[in-house]
Every structure is written in structure tokens, then in C-alpha cells.
């Protein structure tokens, strides 16, 4: 009977042990991983992110429990998207009006990365800088360069294990497998 209690105590201690906080530096670290190591590292990254979400800390507001965003019915989202497409199709609409309308709605790029942002230890300001750099890069290129960029990004995503094996990749690239 006492041995069972010791096993239960050990199990409880192991369950309560936190493997460590995910830091920005750890996620940005470039690692060269191949085959089984790639899968192990992806599982490790997903596990760290899951643990961070389950045990939020007061110093990291993105990981706090509670509603992350206002819940909006899908019909309202569809109406907003329809309104946006209609606004874009009007050729003589003043720029001030369209600018104020688009400022009220969050960027689609921001919404795309919102789940990852909540799971990571990256501050909101750092995240905004990253998004702005991405937007500047896409806006600064011509249409043909933009298509090339999109194609290159797609090809990189399809062969991520090979790229990580040959050249290495930051751990945050593995978040797409979570």
C-alpha cells in the first residue's frame, strides 16, 4: 500500500512539472533536423505550445484564459466580406472613406496568425513589426514578383522537411503542423 502511494505521488509530481516556458529566442533558433528528428521536433514544439496555452502566466497576457476575441456570427462575417468586395469594386470612392472602413476591421494577415500568436511568447509589438515587414515586402513588389513570392512560399511549405534537413529552419515554421 505505501508503494502505491509513492507511485501516485511520483505521478502527480510528474504531471505538475512544467517543461519550461517557450521563449522567442527558442522559437527563432535555426535547427537542422532530418526525418525522425523533424517529427520529434514538431511534436516538441506543439507540446510546448499546448502547455503554454494550458498554463498561462500573469506576465504573458496573450496566454491568459478567457475569450480571445469577440464572437461574431458567421452571417455577420459574410456580410462584412460582401461589403468589402462591393467597396473595392466602386472606382470613384474617396480614399478617406475606404481607409476608415478598413481600419475598423482587423487585417486578414493578423487573423491568420492570431492562433499562433496566442500560443507563442512573442509580444504583440514584435508581432506587429513582423506583419508590417511582410506587408511592405508584398506591397513593394510588382504583380509578377508577388506571384513569384507566393509560388516560392508555396513550394517552400510543400518541402519544409527537406529544407529543414538541408539548410535548417526556425522552430516556429513547425507550428503549421500543430
Swiss-Prot record:
Residues 1-20 form the signal peptide. Keywords: Cleavage on pair of basic residues, Disulfide bond, Hormone, Secreted, Signal. Induction: During squamous cell differentiation. Repressed by retinoic acid. Disulfide bonds join 34-165, 46-178, 164-169. Residues 54-150 form a propeptide. GO terms for molecular function: hormone activity. The keyword Transcription regulation does not apply. It is found in: Secreted. InterPro entries: Insulin-like (IPR016179), Insulin-like_sf (IPR036438), Insulin_CS (IPR022353), Relaxin (IPR022421), Repro_Hormone_Insulin-like (IPR051042). GO terms for cellular component: extracellular region. Belongs to the insulin family. Heterodimer of a B chain and an A chain linked by two disulfide bonds. This is Relaxin-like protein SQ10. It comes from Oryctolagus cuniculus.
Amino acid at each position: 500500500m505505501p508503494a502505491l502511494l509513492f507511485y501516485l505521488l511520483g505521478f502527480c509530481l510528474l504531471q505538475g512539472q512544467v517543461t519550461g516556458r517557450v521563449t522567442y529566442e527558442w522559437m527563432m533558433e535555426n535547427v537542422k533536423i532530418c526525418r525522425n528528428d523533424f517529427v520529434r521536433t514538431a511534436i516538441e514544439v506543439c507540446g510546448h505550445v499546448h502547455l503554454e496555452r494550458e498554463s498561462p502566466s500573469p506576465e504573458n497576457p496573450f496566454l491568459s484564459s478567457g475569450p480571445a476575441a469577440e464572437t461574431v456570427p458567421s452571417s455577420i462575417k459574410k456580410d462584412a466580406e460582401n461589403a468589402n468586395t462591393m467597396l473595392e469594386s466602386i472606382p470613384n470612392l474617396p480614399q478617406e472613406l475606404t481607409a476608415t472602413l478598413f481600419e475598423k476591421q482587423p487585417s486578414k494577415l493578423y487573423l491568420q496568425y492570431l492562433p499562433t500568436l496566442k500560443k507563442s511568447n512573442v509580444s504583440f509589438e514584435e508581432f506587429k513589426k513582423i506583419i508590417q515587414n511582410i506587408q511592405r515586402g508584398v506591397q513593394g513588389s510588382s504583380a509578377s514578383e508577388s506571384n513569384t513570392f507566393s509560388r516560392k512560399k508555396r513550394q517552400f511549405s510543400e518541402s519544409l522537411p527537406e529544407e529543414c534537413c538541408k539548410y535548417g529552419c526556425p522552430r516556429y515554421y513547425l507550428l503549421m503542423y500543430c
